[in-house]
């Protein structure tokens, strides 16, 4: 499950901290994104610009949403590329396991220059977070973290969500999975790397299950229930006909073959 370490990120709703030496950032951009950098290779900048635009369209479609708010002009999302992991963590204040972070209200993504596969995963994951919250209405109450991260993981790479059963079955044999109550109470900042990895894997698997078993339109309906202020149990009942979170946990475990 090495790939899950690569996408570990921090989801934030507070204002983005001041970036060090703001005047020293260079900028480039595309239709929907502004990219801030210092010494990032030109090839990386070109790929970030091109790939972020592809994610902007693909992720919206993957989640089954219809866009009404477009990131144009001054409303473009901003991507900050630090020169190293040390610089990124120093000025963003993120933990050592973080490869990227996103500040939802400001549509700001922070990461650092690294191998393309890792950076691409971070980019897709964080764009997924912004789109997910934007389509739900960022002024609404907070979502369950497992749903937030699971949706971002699915938007990032649906195929990888389908690969999690092998890892989850092995984890189940070695000591068990998180219950839904444990997922709901999970705090990444207070957890170890193995627990964080398991949390991401379970979260992405649950959301992947909802897509695979019920389809994209039902997930959009599920999210619409949250937008209307419904709680998790009522949203599950309305969109999927499930009795609530306990019913979802039972059906998901049956889907994995570990009930």
Which residues fall in each region the model found?
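Sec-dependent N-terminal signal peptides
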Residues: 4-13
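A broad, structure-centric signal for solvent-exposed, well-ordered loop/edge residues
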Residues: 8, 42, 88-89, 130, ...
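Selective for proline/serine-rich intrinsically disordered segments
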Residues: 13-15, 103
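Sec/Tat signal peptide C-region and signal peptidase I cleavage site
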Residues: 16-20
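Juxtacatalytic substrate-recognition/specificity segment
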Residues: 21-139, 144, 232
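Acidic/His/Gly-enriched intrinsically disordered linker/tail segments
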Residues: 94-97, 102-106, 118, 138-259
């Amino acid at each position: 499950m090495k790939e899950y370490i690569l996408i570990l990120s921090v989801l934030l709703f507070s204002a983005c901290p001041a970036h060090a030496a703001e005047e020293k950032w260079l900028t480039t951009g595309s239709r929907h994104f502004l990219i801030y950098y210092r010494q990032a290779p030109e090839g990386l900048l070109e790929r970030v610009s091109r790939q972020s635009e592809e994610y902007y369209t693909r992720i919206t479609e993957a989640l089954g949403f219809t866009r009404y708010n477009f990131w144009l002009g001054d409303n473009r999302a901003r991507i900050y590329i630090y020169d190293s992991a040390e610089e990124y963590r120093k000025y963003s204040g993120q933990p050592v396991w973080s490869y990227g972070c996103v500040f939802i209200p400001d549509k700001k993504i922070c990461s650092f220059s690294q191998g393309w596969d890792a950076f691409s995963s971070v980019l897709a994951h964080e764009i997924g977070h912004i789109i997910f919250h934007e389509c739900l209405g960022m002024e609404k109450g907070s979502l369950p973290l497992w749903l937030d991260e699971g949706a971002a993981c699915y938007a990032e790479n649906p195929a990888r969500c389908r690969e999690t059963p092998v890892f989850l079955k092995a984890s189940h044999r070695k000591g068990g999975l998180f219950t839904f109550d444990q997922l709901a109470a999970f705090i990444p900042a207070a957890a170890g790397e193995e627990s964080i990895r398991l949390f991401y894997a379970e979260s992405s698997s649950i959301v992947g299950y909802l897509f695979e078993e019920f389809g994209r339109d039902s997930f959009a309906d599920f999210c619409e229930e949250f937008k209307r202020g419904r709680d998790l149990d009522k949203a599950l009942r309305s969109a999927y006909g499930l009795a609530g979170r306990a019913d979802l946990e039972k059906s998901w475990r049956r889907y994995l073959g570990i009930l």
